């Protein structure tokens, strides 16, 4: 603040508005509240100050409103890397069960649930499979496990995988992990399960990724008995390329690869980063499939969990698991959790209808993950084998040329280049930007700063001390002064009446409770009640 000048201002209290206006660093106040009478110049300065303050407050309100809308912006960038983690690759044969592995006991328990067969059709279906009918006196097993059926009758990778190479080095079924999906028994390459080291690549282009040759075993496909959701009409495999943290939803996101073709899949890694509320709607909380929700919240909500990391597909899968577990008291084979696997009857009467109803209602509210990795893909294909190579492949694989054309496919998955894209949401308006805008508007319109605000607060404290606290102090001082005057008046009246009294000598008066010394040689005593 500016120093006080002049004897007149020096005598004024600090709470005086003129003293504050003449010393405050805020522009214009000295012209409004300065010394002198009311004039046109003072009025114009007052109008200018009021208009500037109003404009400043309006701009501050607009900036605060914009900040509270929590806008965000998306930044797209491309970065280079010397080494990239190779994605997980999940493979599923489109045919869920091999016809050669089905037994009369399987048809008795699961024929209706999986194939839509009536009991009277079992014998005809077995004949269509080329299998003998059930012997006379056939007795089904007392119990049946759907998980064991898929594990036993699903296609084996040992039979399907004809050749495997990663970065030019041989690989085999031991490099794949068995996983169950809605399509049955599947296999994942580079899953990272059980703490296995993730494979990486240091070069892009063909020959620097995964090269496999598969036999789809079309002779093992189930006959199409009737129009049923579980019986496929196509031949080939489904492939999903995904991150190791994300469970495969291959029935919805898988790519179709057909026999008789070599398919090339060029990938580019994309790292996505989204903002949590209120700037965005992402989540990093996992949904526990074993958690039993409250009746008012049947599907529950994501709850913090250190493992596994939250993914969109993982949330949907956990949501489906909880829904089926609540409706049916069991789970389907591909669903995670500790709930018992549904029986074939529960599959048919409860689990399948519950999943279909849930998908129609879109009951799972799964937000985007705050951080995720996905892979952009470009596909191309050529026919195999060529006429020149058909005889060579037939000798190498010990298969006929016709069999190779109908059952064998090749798949090459590789990175296009060792670079990756980043898609990142950022806050469009930070708190520092808000404070900077407020400071700029403050300096532009009223010529003030943060120290000016401190001066105003200091002035308000002076006003409070002088006006409010001073009022109570003066009131208390006035009451104390009135009591003193009353006491002095009482003393004066008694002192003037003493000479008119004709009292004889009396013994000395003992000391009393209230005394007032009038002189060095005489002391007068009064009772408290006389005051």
Curated annotation (Swiss-Prot):
<dbReference type="GO" id="GO:0050965">
    <property type="term" value="P:detection of temperature stimulus involved in sensory perception of pain"/>
</dbReference>
<feature type="topological domain" description="Extracellular">
    <location>
        <begin position="62"/>
        <end position="441"/>
    </location>
</feature>
<keyword id="KW-0813">Transport</keyword>
<feature type="glycosylation site" description="N-linked (GlcNAc...) asparagine">
    <location>
        <position position="398"/>
    </location>
</feature>
<feature type="topological domain" description="Cytoplasmic">
    <location>
        <begin position="461"/>
        <end position="531"/>
    </location>
</feature>
<keyword id="KW-0739">Sodium transport</keyword>
<dbReference type="GO" id="GO:0160125">
    <property type="term" value="F:pH-gated sodium channel activity"/>
</dbReference>
<dbReference type="GO" id="GO:0160128">
    <property type="term" value="F:pH-gated monoatomic ion channel activity"/>
</dbReference>
<dbReference type="InterPro" id="IPR004724">
    <property type="entry name" value="ENaC_chordates"/>
</dbReference>
<keyword id="KW-0325">Glycoprotein</keyword>
<keyword id="KW-1133">Transmembrane helix</keyword>
<comment type="similarity">
    <text>Belongs to the amiloride-sensitive sodium channel (TC 1.A.6) family. ASIC3 subfamily.</text>
</comment>
<dbReference type="InterPro" id="IPR001873">
    <property type="entry name" value="ENaC"/>
</dbReference>
<dbReference type="GO" id="GO:0009408">
    <property type="term" value="P:response to heat"/>
</dbReference>
<dbReference type="GO" id="GO:0050966">
    <property type="term" value="P:detection of mechanical stimulus involved in sensory perception of pain"/>
</dbReference>
<dbReference type="GO" id="GO:0050968">
    <property type="term" value="P:detection of chemical stimulus involved in sensory perception of pain"/>
</dbReference>
<feature type="short sequence motif" description="PDZ-binding">
    <location>
        <begin position="528"/>
        <end position="531"/>
    </location>
</feature>
<keyword id="KW-0407">Ion channel</keyword>
<keyword id="KW-0472">Membrane</keyword>
<keyword id="KW-0894">Sodium channel</keyword>
<keyword id="KW-0406">Ion transport</keyword>
<feature type="disulfide bond">
    <location>
        <begin position="315"/>
        <end position="366"/>
    </location>
</feature>
<dbReference type="GO" id="GO:0050915">
    <property type="term" value="P:sensory perception of sour taste"/>
</dbReference>
<keyword id="KW-0597">Phosphoprotein</keyword>
<feature type="transmembrane region" description="Helical">
    <location>
        <begin position="44"/>
        <end position="61"/>
    </location>
</feature>
<dbReference type="GO" id="GO:0042931">
    <property type="term" value="F:enterobactin transmembrane transporter activity"/>
</dbReference>
<feature type="transmembrane region" description="Helical">
    <location>
        <begin position="442"/>
        <end position="460"/>
    </location>
</feature>
<keyword id="KW-1015">Disulfide bond</keyword>
<keyword id="KW-0963">Cytoplasm</keyword>
<feature type="disulfide bond">
    <location>
        <begin position="330"/>
        <end position="342"/>
    </location>
</feature>
<keyword id="KW-0915">Sodium</keyword>
<comment type="function">
    <text>Forms pH-gated heterotrimeric sodium channels that act as postsynaptic excitatory receptors in the nervous system. Upon extracellular acidification, these channels generate a biphasic current with a fast inactivating and a slow sustained phase. ASIC3 is more sensitive to protons and gates between closed, open, and desensitized states faster than other ASICs. Displays high selectivity for sodium ions but can also permit the permeation of other cations. As a neuronal acid sensor, probably contributes to mechanoreception, acid nociception, and heat nociception.</text>
</comment>
<feature type="disulfide bond">
    <location>
        <begin position="92"/>
        <end position="186"/>
    </location>
</feature>
<feature type="region of interest" description="Disordered">
    <location>
        <begin position="285"/>
        <end position="307"/>
    </location>
</feature>
<feature type="topological domain" description="Cytoplasmic">
    <location>
        <begin position="1"/>
        <end position="43"/>
    </location>
</feature>
<feature type="disulfide bond">
    <location>
        <begin position="319"/>
        <end position="364"/>
    </location>
</feature>
<keyword id="KW-1003">Cell membrane</keyword>
<dbReference type="Pfam" id="PF00858">
    <property type="entry name" value="ASC"/>
</dbReference>
<dbReference type="GO" id="GO:0051899">
    <property type="term" value="P:membrane depolarization"/>
</dbReference>
<feature type="short sequence motif" description="GAS motif; ion selectivity filter">
    <location>
        <begin position="447"/>
        <end position="449"/>
    </location>
</feature>
<dbReference type="InterPro" id="IPR020903">
    <property type="entry name" value="ENaC_CS"/>
</dbReference>
<feature type="glycosylation site" description="N-linked (GlcNAc...) asparagine">
    <location>
        <position position="175"/>
    </location>
</feature>
